[in-house]
């Protein structure tokens, strides 16, 4: 037995998202992706008194040529602990901007969180798109594993949370746990600084006079959309009278708003993020009295908007996407688990999540969560890995086919990992074997990245090596993880 929205998260969050992002994709989820219950927001407008992270620090430092000023557009501010319907925190505060410079170590903004407990926290940044915003705003995340650099295109994605990554931070306020935005850029223009959020947190949207009392990642998309600054028509089409229908529709409308004015949704207003496709992973109801596998169903919609998507593409592109996904899932599950996994059908039906998106979209009804034969595999982490990899490969195939490009599938995880003391003093010899994938001829390992963690810290940014072995220097008495 399982709850559908939590069960499908167990495929998406630990498996599919990392696979897509490791392959270079930019991914958005309409529900909170971080399972961390704690949340700290550091903002130029200050922290809410008595709220988590009240010891956090924001500061901005000017240079000789660039100083920080307040933007003319509103920014984020957390003025309340609990938000009512149609209250937008991204219209409650201010944001800061500075002119760019080509030299390093000039003007910068700094967000230092007061972390309530040691652990892993997703890091989200926010900013306003301004005249002259650059496409290479330089963010540095200082975490327990070191420093990780990101370049963010501030010409798109204004006034919402932009996910950078998930990192380990120690409890308290530390100079090795913070986010820095530099005004260094190859482009002449401005960078903008607004709130930075650490951790997924607890739900803070009140319905019926109270909040859910649940971590935000367990809540519906309607409530996350409000916290993420979406306009009311995106998440409140039923004006607070039918949250279930709003929760279904907001998933598509959020994609449309984020992609509005981009190449893939040029006809709608929005934030200009070029999302190319949308996939909803569901589990289905129903059971077999004969204890047979029910299997996977694909859903798409062609009979809408005169058969066209918003970029003018034929809506049968959604059928292509659905077909590729079902074909890959059936092939990989059958080959890996030696079961007669069923490809049920491709439905051309009128569903919100396949009708409303401006881009090619599909629903994958993976299996029946009421059917024992399906759920014998459903909770197996090896099955979840196989499903995640099949979905990743299908999406890769679809995107590359749309662009007329060849694709290479990322290799499988290594095996036979071993650690031995090195020939030189205070060294370790790491060795492993690259895994060939019998299902994917392109998935051949050519290079590897070795990540190191010292003590109970976080993993570093890794070292790329060309052979299945690596020598590392160590200090006696310290625990190392790889």
What are these regions (language model features)?
Residues 1, 215-319, 347-370:
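Active-site microenvironments of hydrolase-like enzyme catalytic domains
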Residues 94, 99, 195-203, 283-307, ...:
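Active-site-adjacent mobile loop/cap segments within catalytic or ligand-binding domains
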Residues 95-97, 107-131:
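A short beta-strand element within beta-rich, extracytoplasmic domains
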Residues 129-148:
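Short, surface-exposed beta-strand/strand-loop-strand elements in extracellular ectodomains
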Residues 144-174:
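Extracellular carbohydrate recognition and processing domains
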Residues 179-190:
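Short beta-strand-plus-loop segments that form exposed binding edges in beta-rich domains
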Residues 398-442:
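Pro/Thr/Ser/Gly-rich low-complexity, intrinsically disordered linker/stalk tracts
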Residues 471-482:
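Beta-strand-rich modules
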